[in-house]
């Protein structure tokens, strides 16, 4: 059957309506923040009723209220025959995990899987991509662990940091030559990022000149 895809604005509108009808104060529970919690729950593959049960079991009053919004939010999406962006991936992953014939069909269909900006992928995106690549295991990812800036949107740096462990036979190509910056800028950048212990490690260099000193 057909369905409608809700973008972020649509989802926010539904969350606001849910808060209003559940008599929950928007000032204490900002709609965008609530939507973020819902998105992270879906990224963890927690369906609404399951998430509510977990929050009630933990005795977390605030999260329980958010979970009740999640339940109502999903009910309204269902009534509208709508999916949000997270639902699209979540239901696809669940379909592939639960139906071996469907999984095998799409694993045969996609001989190569390539992902750019892999450091910005979340759990659901990882599960979808790795499942599709599970047939031929021709899985190529491009990313920079030093440029992971979207954790607030659910991105998990562990996806790229653990790639070599998950795919033992993979080949890692470090792209360390920089074409945009001067030597002084790269030296400063290398010195700063070197303090981050949670990275693969690389040393940027350039054929460009020294450039101006940093002030």
Where are these regions (language model features)?
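Conserved coupling/interface region of RecA-like P-loop/ASCE motor cores
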Residues: 1, 147-205, 212-214
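Short hinge/gating elements
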Residues: 1-2, 20, 53-57, 73-78, ...
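Conserved P-loop NTPase-based nucleic-acid remodeling module centered on helicase motor cores
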Residues: 1-37, 50, 57
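Phosphate/oxyanion-binding loops and surfaces in catalytic or ligand/nucleic-acid-binding neighborhoods
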Residues: 21-25, 40-45, 166, 188-196
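Short, well-structured alpha-helical segments
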Residues: 28-42, 63, 67, 86
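Alpha-helix N-cap and coil->helix boundary residues
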Residues: 29-33, 46, 83, 105, ...
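Conserved helicase NTPase motor core
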Residues: 58-162, 174-184
